[in-house]
């Protein structure tokens, strides 16, 4: 038994399921999860000392690579001055100014401690600002584990939402409507059936929680138009795409201006940080300037602010955005080419520094239903083959994978060599 397996058994005695976030348990792929001892650059090292080229990157934040010296030193320096004050600091101002400069639609913003907190707060603000209760999300998009967002579609496009987790009251979930990603008609139908009742649309501009699904042409433009016509706010959940799809986020990549934006992951440089912000008119509606209440003891934590500021300052250096996108495209194109050489049907999507692949005969993947039709068992087999070859991908067919600026040509080529061998095994097994 490996040390990771031993630790997993031990963890289950005191931690539900042995993990502090469900996807880490490998339920989506089977087997025992890797317990990480340390990480550096493009690599993680498990409790048994084995190295893996990492394409999870702590689920997105490690865009500069693990254990970056500049971020590490920023954290040490900040920690020496104190770990938490519960009072304003100058670094909060510097961080807010930098984020607003990089993402201009965020005229004002507030720091929080997680992406879930950011989306939860943005939705409360949208409801308070519009005076409406209902919100519209998309099937397969994940916006954190707040009650109003753990909702799935009903049996038809116009039915009330149903809780996707016990503990979420059905009476509460009924205020959340669920449309089909990349389908504007489904959005229009819900607005028509709930005239004047929908406060906002919240969307992952590139869906990263049903693997990696970009918007079809005109989708985001259509959402912007519908919100303008109906008096609803458009919220871009850029917790995953922020600074990764482009330096200014997916909204810069697709040239769309949302009313509110939520951020997380990259913004903290590896520390627990989130943020929400948008039009000044809307943000002024939040306490203490407005009636919508939101607060947090650790919001704007000085150590986390120092890490995030160092990360974004490095990330904005000239050439980094293009380098990240270029190496990710090279990797994605390589996966697609190698799969084709071995007769393995594979759809590969890539935007900026995120990518995903689907074992399927379908020509393209545009929504959650398409993902459910993919060969999930073949994904599980490929995942474990890649683990055996020293490559760590997202342990779920419904999660995107990520590159970092620390992934050099050596790591990319080693990954493609491993994929070549693994595709060959899959092809042989299917004969």
Curated annotation (Swiss-Prot):
Any one GO molecular function term: glutamate-1-semialdehyde 2,1-aminomutase activity
N6-(pyridoxal phosphate)lysine carried by residues: 265
The EC number(s) this enzyme carries: 5.4.3.8
Pfam family, one: Aminotran_3
Catalytic reaction list: (S)-4-amino-5-oxopentanoate = 5-aminolevulinate
Pathway(s) annotated for this protein in UniProt: Porphyrin-containing compound metabolism; protoporphyrin-IX biosynthesis; 5-aminolevulinate from L-glutamyl-tRNA(Glu): step 2/2
Subunit structure: Homodimer.
Protein name, entry field: Glutamate-1-semialdehyde 2,1-aminomutase
Organism lineage string: Bacteria, Pseudomonadati, Pseudomonadota, Gammaproteobacteria, Vibrionales
């Amino acid at each position: 038994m490996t040390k990771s397996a031993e630790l997993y058994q031990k963890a289950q005695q005191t931690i539900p399921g042995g993990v502090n976030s469900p996807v880490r348990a490998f339920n989506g792929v089977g087997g025992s999860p890797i317990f990480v001892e340390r990480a550096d650059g493009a690599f993680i090292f498990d409790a048994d000392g084995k190295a893996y080229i990492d394409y999870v990157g702590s689920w997105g934040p490690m865009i500069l690579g693990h254990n970056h010296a500049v971020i590490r030193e920023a954290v040490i320096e900040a920690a020496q001055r104190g770990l938490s004050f519960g009072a304003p600091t100058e670094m909060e101002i510097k961080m807010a100014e930098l984020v607003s400069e990089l993402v201009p639609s965020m005229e004002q913003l507030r720091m929080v401690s997680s992406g879930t907190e950011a989306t939860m707060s943005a939705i409360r603000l949208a409801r308070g600002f519009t005076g409406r209760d209902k919100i519209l999300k998309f099937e397969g998009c994940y916006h954190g584990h707040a009650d109003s967002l753990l909702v799935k579609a009903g049996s038809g496009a116009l039915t009330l939402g149903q809780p996707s987790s016990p503990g979420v009251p059905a009476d509460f979930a009924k205020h959340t409507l669920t449309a089909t990603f990349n389908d504007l008609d489904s959005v229009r139908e819900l607005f028509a059936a709930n005239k004047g009742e929908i406060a906002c649309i919240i969307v992952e501009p590139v869906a990263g929680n049903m693997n990696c699904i970009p918007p079809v042409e005109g989708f985001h433009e259509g959402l912007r138009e519908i919100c303008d016509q109906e008096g609803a706010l458009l919220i871009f959940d850029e917790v995953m795409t922020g600074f990764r799809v482009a330096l200014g986020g997916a909204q810069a990549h697709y040239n769309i201006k949302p009313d509110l934006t939520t951020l997380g992951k990259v913004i903290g440089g590896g520390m627990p940080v989130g943020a929400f912000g948008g039009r000044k008119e809307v943000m002024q509606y939040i306490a203490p300037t407005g009636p919508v209440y939101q607060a947090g003891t650790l919001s704007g934590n000085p150590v986390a602010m120092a890490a995030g500021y160092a990360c974004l300052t490095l990330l904005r250096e000239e050439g980094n955005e293009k380098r990240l996108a270029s190496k990710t495209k090279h990797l994605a194109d390589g996966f697609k080419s190698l799969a084709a050489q071995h007769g393995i049907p594979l759809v590969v999507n890539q935007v900026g520094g995120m990518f995903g692949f689907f074992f399927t005969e379908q020509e393209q993947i545009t929504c959650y239903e398409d993902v459910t039709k993919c060969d999930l068992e073949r994904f599980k087999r490929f995942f474990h083959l890649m683990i055996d070859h020293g490559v760590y991908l997202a342990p779920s067919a419904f999660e995107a994978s990520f590159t970092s600026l620390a992934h050099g040509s050596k790591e990319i080529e080693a990954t493609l060599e491993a994929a070549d061998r693994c595709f060959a095994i899959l092809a042989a097994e299917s004969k």
